[in-house]
Amino acid sequence: MSRFQLEEMLRAGVHFGHLARRWCPKMKPYIFMEKNGVHIIDLQKTLVLADDALNALEAIAQTGREIMFVGTKKQAKRIISAEAERAGMPYVCERWLGGMLTNFSTIRQSIRRMNSIDRMETDGTFDMITKKERLMLVREKEKLMRILGGIATMTRLPAALFVVDIKKEHIAIKEARSLGIPIFAMVDTNCDPELVDFIIPANDDAIRSIQLMVKAVADTIVNSRELKVEQEVLAGMDEEDGDAVEGDAAGE
């Protein structure tokens, strides 16, 4: 059974693509028709491909690895940050820094610098420096937080990327591909689907469409993590029961 309903996709406008004259011919298999100069996405295919993508993301989440959410366009920023935080995943919703993946060691240095300034605010260091120095450090931290705050806890490269608008996030796509990191993405009719490992043909401009898909990804991760915890608890209980049985047998 699909995790989506056709009606909810229609209400969210998932089926509305771009102007036909701006299309990418490689998206032809996922286009249902052209109406008033606009391509209409085949939602039957979206249903199937979205389920495939979510199943694969579920498998990754169960390993405990991280999935990075990426979406820096205006319509996606708040959705990306809110849903990624709910799922406990790293995210980028402001500017993508070149080398965020391919030069991760340098990015980690910037994150450590950000965390260092944060500690200065609480350990009394700020009381020992001038007002001007404090102001400069606060501004530096705010700048770093704006760009790197979503990946502040990330200690290694993500296991996968989930992207909204691969055309806008082309640098992130290029970096992930060069490192062999699987890419899951909402792909509109003006984008090249061959750049993505798991395509979700969908309107990547409408807020409701973005919300529907990003929420589904976050829900999948949250549910997968909760299931993993439940399985670990049950496994622990089974081990305890087994030890108790062995103890009783030894006592006899």
UniProtKB/Swiss-Prot annotation:
Pfam families: Ribosomal_S2. It comes from the Bacteria. Belongs to the universal ribosomal protein uS2 family. InterPro entries: Ribosomal_uS2 (IPR001865), Ribosomal_uS2_bac/mit/plastid (IPR005706), Ribosomal_uS2_CS (IPR018130), Ribosomal_uS2_flav_dom_sf (IPR023591). PROSITE patterns: RIBOSOMAL_S2_1 (PS00962), RIBOSOMAL_S2_2 (PS00963). GO terms for molecular function: structural constituent of ribosome. GO terms for cellular component: cytosolic small ribosomal subunit. The gene is rpsB. GO terms for biological process: translation. Keywords: Ribonucleoprotein, Ribosomal protein. This is Small ribosomal subunit protein uS2.
